[in-house]
Amino acid sequence: MINIRDPNRLYNFYNEVTRLHMTCMPDWRVGQFWMNFLGWVQNEKKCDPFFPEESEMLTYLKEYCGEKEDING
């Protein structure tokens, strides 16, 4: 049997994403928000956005939104 991640983990992730989107960039469309953020992850963090787990993506997103210090220096 394949062990899968708990799907309920996504509620906290998306609630935090929604909070950051509504607080930091409320005028951006959803696609604009995600594409700009994912491009930033790839270009500034030199990280393929396909691979980070939710906790790492939230750390990046908080940094992108100006809520946290840079985790890479």
Mark where each language-model region is.
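Short, charged early-sequence alpha-helical segments and their helix-coil boundaries
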Residues: 43-73
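Polar low-complexity intrinsically disordered regions
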Residues: 1, 33, 72-73
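A generic secondary-structure boundary signal that marks alpha-helix termini
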Residues: 26, 42-43
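Catalytic phosphate/metal-binding cores of nucleic-acid and nucleotide-processing enzymes, i.e., regions
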Residues: 18, 34-35, 40
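Short, structural beta-strand-to-alpha-helix junction motif
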Residues: 29-30, 53
